[in-house]
Swiss-Prot record:
This protein is involved in the repair of mismatches in DNA. It is required for dam-dependent methyl-directed DNA mismatch repair. May act as a 'molecular matchmaker', a protein that promotes the formation of a stable complex between two or more DNA-binding proteins in an ATP-dependent manner without itself being part of a final effector complex. The keyword Cell membrane does not apply. Keywords: DNA damage, DNA repair. One of its GO terms (cellular component) is mismatch repair complex. Gene3D superfamilies: 3.30.230.10, Histidine kinase-like ATPase, C-terminal domain (3.30.565.10), MutL, C-terminal domain, dimerisation subdomain (3.30.1540.20), MutL, C-terminal domain, regulatory subdomain (3.30.1370.100). The lineage of its organism: Bacteria, Pseudomonadati, Pseudomonadota, Gammaproteobacteria, Pasteurellales. PROSITE patterns: DNA_MISMATCH_REPAIR_1. This is DNA mismatch repair protein MutL.
Length: 637
C-alpha cells in the first residue's frame, strides 16, 4: 500500500482514540472549554451514563457566528497563536482537537450566543459527515454542546463501555476534581433528569470549606492541615491530613499544577516520602494540593489527555513539596486537635439558587479569556524579590464536629481561602535564564565529594590499613574481621555512628547547601534550647540564619554526611531536649540519624576504610573499642 495522506474524517477518528476514551473524557474536555470561556455556571446533563446524551451548558462568552463552524475544525483554537503561547500555557485547552475528535464519533450539536449578538446560532455534525450549516436558534448568552449517541459509528468502541452506573461514576469523579480547583464556579450535575451533584459558587471561607467537605467528606476537613508554602516563584497551598486519616485506597489524592488536575510521579513521590515515617506501604495519604509556578517552567504538552506534566527543575519541585508537607506534619504534632472552634451550625450556608440565564459575564475577546497569562500582567509595575526566606503558614480548619486543625501564626487568610475579588494577582516575574545561570544552577545540583583517597576494594584482599581483613558480612548487621589468627565482630550500626561522629567533629565539616532553605518557628522552650545548642549546631556543620524577634530560624546548609536525613525531624527533636554538653548533643544527634542498610560486603568495607582514614586524624577514638572478640577454638578442637 503506498504512502498517502489520510482523509480528515479518518484522522479525527484516530485522534478520538486518544482524546475520547469514555464518556467521562468527553465531559472533561467540554467542561474545560467552558472554564476557558469564562463561565461562572456550568450545567452537565447525562443520560444513560453518557452513552445516549452528554449536554454541557455554560454562561461563558460564547462563540461568534462566523467562528462556529471553525470551532469544529481540527487544530482550530483561540487559546494559542505562537510558539511562545505554547510555552506559557495557563488555559486548559490549547490543541484544538477536542470538538473535532468528539464530533467524529458522535452526533454533536453546538449552540452559542455572544453578548453582542441578537440571536444564537447552531451547528450540527455527525460522524464522518463533517460538513455543517449554521442555523439560527434560541439560547441565552453562553454555549451548549450536546453529544448524542457516543460511538454510534464505532460499534467496537461502544461495546467496551461499562454499565451506566460505572460510566457515570467516572463522570462524577471528573466533576469532583474540577469543582475542587474552581470553587468560585457553580456546577450542577444531573443523571437521567435527576440532580445528583450541585456545587454552589463558593466565595467566602466557610463556603469553600463546605464544598471541600461535600467532595472529600467531613472527616477530611476535621483532620485537614492547611499549607501555604512559598519559595521564590513557587507556591504550594491546599490541605493535607494528619497520618491518622490514612486511607486503605488512593481515592482522596488531588493535585493541581497551575489549576490543572494532574497525576505526576514527582509530586506523588514527594508527598509519599513526607508521609513515609507515618504510613506503611499499603496506606495512602489524603490531600488536596495546588502548586503554582511560572508556566514557562512546566510543560503541559506531554500527554494526550494532559494528565501528566514535565517540570524544568523536577528536583527543585520535589524538594519544595517534600519540605512543605513535612513541615506541616511536624508542626501539627505540637498542637491538640481536640479543641473546639466552630460548630456545625455556623458552617451551614443557605444561598438562593441564582437564575441561570441572568448571569452575564463581562465582554472580552475569547482568546484573551482563554489564554491570558496572569504571570505577565502588570509586570512593569511589579518589584522582583530576591533572597526571600521561605515561609509556611498553617490556618485553622473549621470542622463540622467541632474539631479543628492547627494554627501557628495569626495571619491573613491564604489565597485559596480568600474571595476571588479580594485576591490580588501576584505574577511570577522572571527574566530569561542565561547560559551562565544555567551552568551555576547545574553546579549547585552537584553533590560535593569528601576529599579522601579512593576507597575501592581489592577483590583479592578485602583488608584495611590496620591489618584487619574483612572475611564476611553477617546478617547485614556486622562485619566478621580477622587480624592474624584472631577473629572479631564489628557491629555496622556502631561503625556508621563512629564514622558520622568523626565527620561531624572535623575542624571544617564538609557542608551541603540546601536548594530550598527550611524555616522553623520555635516555641519559647525551643527558643531557649536554641540559644544553648546553636554553637553545637555550627560546630557540627549546620548553617542557620536566626530571627530572634519572630522566634524563627532558617536552615541553609547541613553537614554533607546528613544531607539525606529528615532535617526537620532532627532539628525539632534536638530543640525539644535539654542538652548541656557537646558530647550529649552529638549522642542525641546520632540517635536520631537513620542508618542505611549494608547488604554488600564491599560497601561495608568502604565504610570501615573511610572510618580508619578519619581515625588517623585524631587520637581520642579507637576502632578497637568496637571490636567484639570471637573464639572459634572450642569449635575447631
Amino acid at each position: 500500500m503506498p504512502i498517502q495522506i489520510l482523509p480528515p474524517q479518518l484522522a479525527n477518528q484516530i485522534a478520538a482514540g486518544e482524546v475520547v476514551e469514555r464518556p467521562a473524557s468527553v465531559v472533561k474536555e467540554l467542561v474545560e472549554n467552558s472554564l476557558d470561556a469564562g463561565a461562572t455556571r456550568i450545567q452537565i446533563d447525562i443520560e444513560n451514563g453518557g452513552a445516549t446524551l452528554i449536554r454541557i451548558r455554560d454562561n461563558g462568552f460564547g462563540i461568534p457566528k462566523e467562528e462556529l463552524s471553525l470551532a469544529l475544525a481540527r487544530h482550530a483554537t483561540s487559546k494559542i497563536a505562537t510558539i511562545d503561547d505554547l510555552e506559557a500555557i495557563l488555559s486548559f485547552g490549547f490543541r484544538g482537537e477536542a470538538l473535532a475528535s468528539i464530533s467524529s464519533v458522535s452526533r454533536l450539536t453546538l449552540t452559542s450566543r455572544t453578548a453582542d449578538q441578537q440571536e444564537a446560532w447552531q451547528v450540527f455534525v455527525q460522524g464522518r459527515e463533517q460538513e455543517s450549516t449554521v442555523n439560527p436558534a434560541s439560547h441565552p448568552v453562553g454555549t451548549t454542546v450536546e453529544v448524542a449517541n457516543l460511538f454510534f459509528n464505532m460499534p467496537a468502541r461502544r461495546k467496551f463501555l461499562r454499565t451506566d452506573k460505572t460510566e457515570f461514576g467516572h463522570i462524577d469523579e471528573v466533576i469532583r476534581r474540577i469543582a475542587l480547583a474552581k470553587s468560585h464556579i457553580a456546577f450542577t450535575l444531573t443523571h437521567n433528569g435527576k440532580i445528583v451533584r450541585q456545587y454552589k459558587s463558593a466565595v467566602e471561607d466557610t463556603q469553600k470549606l463546605k464544598r471541600l467537605a461535600a467532595i472529600c467528606g467531613n472527616d477530611f476537613v476535621r483532620q485537614a492541615l492547611y499549607i501555604d508554602w512559598k519559595h521564590d516563584n513557587l507556591h504550594l497551598s491546599g490541605w493535607v491530613t494528619t497520618p491518622t486519616f490514612a486511607r486503605q485506597q488512593n481515592d482522596l489524592s488531588y493535585c493541581y499544577v497551575n489549576g490543572r488536575m494532574v497525576k505526576d510521579k514527582v509530586i506523588n513521590h514527594a508527598i509519599r516520602q513526607a508521609y513515609a515515617e507515618h504510613l506503611g506501604s499499603e496506606r495512602y495519604p489524603a490531600f488536596v494540593l495546588f502548586l503554582d509556578l511560572n508556566p514557562n517552567d512546566v510543560d503541559v504538552n506531554v500527554h494526550p489527555t494532559k494528565h501528566e506534566v514535565r517540570f524544568q527543575q523536577s528536583r527543585l519541585i520535589h524538594d519544595f513539596i517534600f519540605q512543605g508537607v513535612t513541615n506541616a506534619l511536624l508542626s501539627a504534632e505540637q498542637f491538640d486537635f481536640s479543641a473546639s472552634t466552630e460548630s456545625e451550625k455556623n458552617n451551614e450556608i443557605r444561598e438562593p439558587q441564582a437564575d441561570y440565564q441572568n448571569v452575564t459575564p463581562t465582554i472580552r475577546p475569547n482568546r484573551a479569556a482563554a489564554g491570558q497569562n496572569m504571570f505577565e500582567l502588570n509586570s512593569p509595575t511589579q518589584t522582583k524579590q530576591t533572597n526571600v526566606p521561605i515561609t509556611t503558614k498553617a490556618y485553622p480548619t473549621p470542622a463540622h464536629s467541632g474539631q479543628a486543625g492547627y494554627s501557628t501564626t495569626p495571619s491573613n487568610p491564604p489565597p485559596h481561602f480568600m474571595p476571588q475579588s479580594a485576591r490580588s494577582v501576584s505574577p511570577f516575574e522572571r527574566e530569561k535564564v542565561t547560559k551562565t545561570e544555567q551552568r551555576i544552577y547545574a553546579e549547585l545540583l552537584k553533590t560535593p565529594e569528601v576529599e579522601a583517597p579512593p576507597t575501592s576494594i581489592q577483590s583479592s584482599l578485602l583488608s584495611s590499613s590496620s591489618l584487619l581483613h574483612a572475611v564476611a558480612l553477617v546478617n547485614n548487621q556486622a562485619l566478621l574481621l580477622q587480624r592474624d589468627t584472631a577473629f572479631y565482630l564489628l557491629p555496622l550500626n556502631k561503625l556508621q555512628k563512629m564514622r558520622l561522629e568523626l565527620l561531624l567533629t572535623l575542624p571544617n565539616t564538609p557542608q551541603q547547601m540546601l536548594l530550598i532553605p527550611v524555616v522553623f518557628r520555635l516555641s519559647d522552650k525551643q527558643q531557649a534550647q536554641w540559644r544553648q545548642q546553636k554553637i553545637w549546631f555550627e560546630q557540627s556543620g549546620f548553617e542557620f540564619i536566626e530571627n530572634p524577634v519572630q522566634h524563627r530560624i532558617t536552615l541553609n546548609a547541613v553537614p554533607q554526611c546528613l544531607r539525606h536525613q529528615n532535617l526537620q525531624k532532627i532539628v525539632i527533636a534536638l530543640l525539644n531536649r535539654s542538652l548541656q554538653k557537646t558530647e550529649k548533643f552529638l549522642t542525641a544527634l546520632l540517635d536520631l540519624v537513620e542508618l542505611p542498610d549494608c547488604q554488600v560486603l564491599a560497601n561495608a568495607v568502604n565504610i570501615l576504610q573511610e572510618t580508619e582514614l578519619l581515625l588517623d586524624q585524631q587520637t581520642t577514638m579507637k576502632l578497637d573499642n568496637l571490636l567484639i572478640p570471637i573464639d572459634f577454638s572450642s569449635y575447631l578442637s
